[in-house]
Every structure is written in C-alpha cells, then in structure tokens.
Amino acid sequence: MSDDQRRRDARDVLVRIIVPRSDEERERVIEATNSQTVVPLASLRAMAPIHRRIETFLELHELYYDRKKNYQKNRGKPRDSTIPVGYLSQAVMAILLRRPNDSRARPSNLLKEDADYDEIFNSEYPLDLYRVCIRVIKGTEAYLKSVSDPIVQSNKNNVKWHLAMFATCVKLQTSRLRAHHIAELAVSDLTIDHFDLCFSHVWQVFSDLTTELGTPDRVGKSNEFVTRLLSRIRDIQAGGITL
C-alpha cells in the first residue's frame, strides 16, 4: 500500500483494552484469546492454579518459580534461586517418577505429554515435594561441581539426574518413592559423605555401561542405566551391597 493509499484508507481498528483485577483473571483472558495469539503449551499450562500455588509456596523458602518467563529476573531475584518450569519438571521426573533418563534426554518435552504433565504436577501432592526436589538437584549440582576429575566434569549432565534419584532412594531406604516420603525428607541429611558413597555406585554403573553402549550421552539417556541403578538400590536395601 502506497503512502497516498494509506492516507485515504478509511478503515477503523477496534482495540479492546482489558485491565485484569488479578493474576487469575489475567490468565483466563490469555487462555481465552489463545486462538488469536498462539501461546506455547508449556506457557499456558504454567498458568494453572497449581503453578500459582507452587510459586507462592516456593517464595516462602526463597525459591522463585519462573512460571512466566523472565518474571523473576525482572523482579531482580537471584539467578541461582530462580526456578524455571522446565527445571522443576526435570527434578520431579528424575526423583519422584524415577525417570532421570527422560530428564536428561527430553527436557523440553516433559510438559507436552498429558500423562507426564499430570504425573509431575498433581494438586494432591504436598507442596514440599517440589521444594525438596529442587533442593536435592541443587545439592547434587553443587556436589558434582566439587569433583575435580575432568571426566566427571564433562559428564555431569549425564549423571546429575541419576545421582539425585539414587541419593534420595538410598536415604529414604526405598526404590519406590512416594510424594509424601520425598516431601518429608530433610535435605540437610544429604551430606557430602552421603553423596560420595552414592556417587561411587552411580559412576561405576555409568562407566560399565559406557563400555557396553559406546558413548556417555547414550548411557545418560538409556533405560538400562536407570534399571541397573534401581536394582543396585534394592540390593543395598537387602544387604547384598554395602555403601
């Protein structure tokens, strides 16, 4: 359209401005208008009431749930204490659902499948579950960062989620984790000594499988890695293997 045509254009544009009175109302408006303006599924799901509850609860513990991208950054909250939705999903998937391989292999897809989403974000779970899962992963990351071996450093992401699951299962003395058990875990009990002992088992299984399967990334994403770790946890419970 030329400048002259634009000047003679008599069409009008109707703009409707809605001022929401609350976050809940704002999110209902966004969801209702999603057919006109496409919003990613993960972003839409993060507007559900359970995510608002998680956000409010975690903030009481100085953890800032970033269910709206960059929201916590814009509030000036510390980066290390800002928890993206995807990160929380990976933490719960790895620990509660005992699927650390999926946390490693497909982090961007955990909120796309209804079955996975419903298992991760369940309104019947105690909110402390989410806090504990975050703290366990943060503790695992800090532990792995302290390990000086360069081979370990290059494979942190291949063993991080698995070590978190293993350390939690061993501390709670079960390979069948339940939400309320995890919620009651005192994260301070996951000491450096505990991580040392658990890591020796995880790393042994990881190393053996790397020899069998060929590449570390393949091991980190494999079902077999999880299967062998859970079997080892059961052996520890039965007294067949000592920590």
Predicted segments with their positions:
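Accessory terminal alpha-helical modules
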Residues: 2-243
